[in-house]
Structures are given as structure tokens and as C-alpha cells.
Amino acid sequence: VNGNLEYVKLKSSDGSIYYLAEENLEFARLDKQYKEKKQWIDGLPKLKTISQIFKERGGYEIVGKISGKDMVGWKYSAPFDGLDAQSELGGYPIRNDALADEGKCGKTEHRVINPGKDNLGSDIVVGGEGTGIVHMAPGCGDIDHKVGKKLNVISIAPLDEESKFTDKFGWLKGKKATDQETIDEIIGYLKENNHLIYVEDYPHIYPHCWRSGDELVFRLVDEWYINMDWRDEIISTVDDINWIPSWGSEREKEWLTGMGDWMISKKRFWGLALPIWEFEDGSFYVVGSKEELKELSIEGWQDFEGKSPHRPWIDKVKIKHPETGLVGSRVEDVGNPWLDAGIVPFSTLGYNDNKNYWQKWFPADFVVESFPGQFRNWFYSLL
């Protein structure tokens, strides 16, 4: 909820109680956006106000009012608490150990929160559109995930790599989230269990794959990052460069100052294989060279030797951890293409084969590029 909004306690004709932002009751939903910016779809009815929806169902009365800040902390039950994933301690499939140790799971931790503002300073929950109450799903979206981490909300991530529901999701298991049949089943379930007020069609901007045209879904997965706590060292290097035009220096510093940790992994087959090996105790080891990899390898070196450090050859190599002695396999991830771009001064100047030659030519005297994207792309990765 938004702590600064006023909410009404609405009693419908069947005696059910609903909480809604007061200003949302008579709000003409999506009316302003489609008058000013977009074209409404021909033949599609305009959206009804919330007040109109309840009047058509037999009417309603307002039996009370409450401030959003007074709702924070309320506990509630949710429509899908019967699914096994909701009973997994610490969340599912990525477990929050601290919450698990406290015996917390999705089913027990539904509570009203005030998510505050986004990174632009705008309220995440607003009056007007919708109900004024937003369900936060930390396992299913970027903003929700950030709020979940900040406020310690249990994360439930339901989808696999094919956007199908995984084992812990009961009657949804194996069904593709974007299939209309799946959507209809979910809507039907909500209706049968009296969790749905109304269904309407409306224009909605939604991300699609630029190649296939398929709908995209958010999916919570573990990734690899370069910690940017050492950003000050990188920023100091900017002053060692003569920028033409001169304002390029400040532009690059602005980007570096606000840059979060750099995600360097991709869930793909093609790409530079990350030299990271994982072990059954949850530890990992970064291999620094082919020579070190050969020294640590206990299996698969003969399949890899003489080939480029890419999949599938490098994936065959298993190593023994130099400290624990555990046997590990390489992570399946490959590197972000901009990670490749950042090592151009090493890969093109023979760093691995001829250090003297590399030292002669590194760093470059002159880099020519077009603006503006390179500040957050190639210049950044080079630095």
C-alpha cells in the first residue's frame, strides 16, 4: 500500500469486505493515457470504474476509512497458499537462509508493506489506476525483487527456462505461463475460489523477443556479478585520460558513480565461457589461466586440450579445489558480450602468449568511438 493514501472499507451486496484507495473508486481508468498518447483498440469497451463494477453487482456501501500507514503490518492469507512452493522455508527455489532459520515461508509471511519509492523517486503504489493495493512478487519482477530484498519479503519464483511452472506448483506444473489455456485456468481457479472481482481486456505494452516475437517473462535466477565497491579506483583512472570533447570525462564519471554491480553472466551456449568452477559445498573457484586449469584438472583435459575455451569442450573439464579437495564442474553460464569487449586489449595483443609484446602496446594511445552509448558500454568495460 501507499502509506500516504486514504483507503475505504467497502461492503458489497453479498456482505464481502474490500479495501480500496478512496480516489480509485470513481477514477476513469486508462482514460487519460489513451487520450493523450495512445490509440484505444477499435471495438474494445472502455474500462469501467470500480464503483460501476460494484454497482452492477448489486451495489455497495462504504463502512469505514483507514490510512495506508495503518494497514502496514497486517497479515493475510493468499489464493495460492495450497501450493507446495509456499511452504518451502526461506522461499523457492532460491532460499533465503536467514528467513529459513526463522521458520518463515511464503504461506506464513503474507503481510502488508509500504514499498516506498522507485529509483526515480516516484511512489511504487499510487492512487488512480487499479485498486491502490499492489501485490509484490519478488520472484517475478525487477522492482518487486528490489523491494523484497530491502524489506525481507519471501521470494517465490515459479518458472523454469521454458517459462513452465516447476514441480512445487501443483496443478500448474509443466504448464507454460504465457499460454492462453494456462491463463484461462488461473482465472477460472480465482473465480471458483471467490478471489476475483472482475475481468476486462485492455491495451497493454508487453515485452517481446525481437527475433521470434514470443512474449517474454521475468524469471528469478542466480547470476554472476563483478562487485563495484572498487568503483573509486576506476573513477580515478578517468582523470588519466584526455577526453575529446572534454565533457566526456564527467559523463563517464556520472555513469560509474551510479553503476550497480556488473552482471557478467548469460544463460546461453554461445559466448566466452566463464572460468568459474562450483563445488557441492556451495563454494566456487576462479581459474586464472589454461596452465592453472591443466594443473587442477582431474577429468576431461584431454577433450579440451588444443581447443578454444568455449562450450562444449571446456565444460568437460572437472577440477579439484586447491584448498578443500572437492571436485567441481564449470558453471554453465557464459560471459556478457561487453565482458568480451572489455578484454580486447588483452585478447588482441597476445596477453596469454607474449607478455612482453602486450606490455609494449598496452594501454592504447587513442580510442575512437561514437557517442552516446559507449559511456556505459565499451568505455566502461575497458576501464
What are these regions (language model features)?
Residues 21-22, 340:
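Zinc-coordinating Cys/His ligand positions in small cysteine/histidine-rich zinc-finger domains
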